[in-house]
Amino acid sequence: WFADERCVAPEDEESNYRLAAEALLDRAPIDAACVHRMRGELGPEQGALSYAGELAGHVQGGGDAGVPVLDVIVLGIGPDGHVASLFPGAQTLSAGAGAICLGVEDSPKPPPQRITLSLAVLRAARACILLATGPSKADAVAGMLGEPTPHVPASLLLRERLTAIVDDAAAPAGPLR
């Protein structure tokens, strides 16, 4: 399962699926039936509807939001504190509690059209691993550890289920909580 995708063809250089395929999926003995890519080529709305249906059909729902509950989700964090394609202050952060997958029309990072899992799905995961490397992520990691705010979407993840793996350059100064 993927957390987000750019609305491009799967073979496009901007495709998260292509990146994952080249770095991992094509190199490991993974059954293709176990890989569920977001269909960015369908566009934001149709791609989100398609993926929401596929995810809901394969993964049991639960929790307060009634959304599919993934065992583990692995996310990166952007320099602005975004996770998946949930950007600071974006409307997608306030999607209804039962939302599974959302179309994004106006990403501040190119390309502007994307598909993303909702915050409800990210928060419902049994465990979340967040990766951050490099000095450009230090402010975002520090913001993630502060008070929850839609200005730093990563701060909205459930901390009791979150494991952050950061290198020295991305680690904020002082003790971590």
Task: Explain the meaning of each model-derived region.
Residues 16-22, 88-97, 146:
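A glycine- and small-aliphatic-rich helix-loop capping segment at beta-alpha/alpha-beta transitions
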Residues 48-49, 84-89, 140-144, 176:
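A short secondary-structure junction signal
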Residues 34-36, 71-73, 99-100, 127-130, ...:
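Structural motif
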Residues 28-29, 64-68, 75, 79, ...:
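Solvent-exposed alpha-helices and their adjacent loops that cap or buttress functional pockets
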Residues 1-71:
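Ligand-binding beta-strand-loop-alpha-helix segment within the catalytic cores
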Residues 72-120:
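Class I SAM-dependent methyltransferase SAM-binding "motif I" and its flanking Rossmann-like core
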Residues 6, 77-82, 135-136, 170:
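Short glycine-rich anion-binding loops that position phosphate/pyrophosphate groups of nucleotides
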Residues 120, 124-177:
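ATP/nucleoside-binding phosphotransfer catalytic cores, i.e., glycine-rich phosphate-binding loops
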